[in-house]
Amino acid sequence: MSARVAVESSQCPKSVSVIVPVFNEVSTIDALQDQFDRIDFAGSRCEVIFVDGGSTDGTRDRVRAPYRLIDQEGRGRGGALNTGARAAEGEVLFFLHCDSVLPEGAFREIGEVLSRTRVGTFGIRFSKLTPVLMLCQVMSNLRVRFRHISYGDQGLFIERDLFFKAGMFPDVPLMEDFQFALNLKRLGEPIGMTRHRIRTSARRFPNGEVDRLRVWVNMARLRSRYVKGASPEELALAYGNVR
C-alpha cells in the first residue's frame, strides 16, 4: 500500500484505507486524486480504493495508479462502502465522498483523534456559504459534538475491527450512515471530531435559500420518521420528493 508524494506529511501512526464510493463522478474524481498525490503518508501504509457503482460517464477510466478501482457489491451507498471495507487492508477505514476537500494535515488529525477514541469524523464546512448552509453547517458540527451522530459527507474514520463489530453499514437505500452512527452509540463508542474541517460540495441542496431550507427541514423530518420506525425503503421514496 503506497501512494506517497513528499508535500504534506500524514503522521498517522496506523495504516489507513481510504474508501471512496463513486457513481458518475467524472467531474470530481480528478481533483480528489490530485489531493492524494500531494500527501506524504509518512511511513503509515495507505491505500485509496474507489468503489464504482456502475458509472457510465467515464469515471472508471479516470482512476489512476496507484489507486485501486473495484466494483460495488450490494445496493446503495452502504453496499459500496461495505465492498470497500471488505477489500481494504488498513487498520483504519476512512470513508470519504468524492467531492470532498481535505484540510491540510488531515491524516495527522485522524491519528490525533484515534489516540483518544476508536472512531472519528471531520467538522464540516460547505464550499458555498449562504445563511441556510451556514446554519446546516453549524448544526451538523454540534450534532457530532453533543450527540455523536455523523453523516457520510463529514468523512468517517474508524478502526477496522470496530467497523465490523458494529455490523458494517446496513444494506438499505437511505439512512445507512445514520443507522451506523446509532449502532456505534449502542456499543458505547463516541465519535471524536477533528479540529479542522472538511470542505464538501453543496450540490445536494437546490439553488435558492427557501428551497435549501425546505430540503434541510424535510431531511430532518425523514430522520425523525426513521427513528420512529419508518422503513428505509419508504423513506427513499419520500427522499426523491424533498430535493
Regions inferred by a protein language model and the residue ranges of each:
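Cell-envelope/extracellular polymer assembly enzymes that use nucleotide-activated donors
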Residues: 15-17, 47, 179
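Short, well-formed alpha-helical segments that are part of the catalytic scaffolds
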Residues: 25-40
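A conserved acidic beta->alpha catalytic loop
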Residues: 35, 52-60, 99-101
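Acidic donor-binding/catalytic loop of UDP-sugar-dependent glycosyltransferases
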Residues: 58, 98-112, 182
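Short aromatic/hydrophobic "clamp" motif used to bind/position activated sugar donors
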Residues: 93
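Conserved donor NDP-sugar-binding/catalytic core segment of glycosyltransferases
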Residues: 104-132
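Catalytic donor-sugar/metal-binding loop of nucleotide-sugar-dependent glycosyltransferases
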Residues: 170-172, 182-199
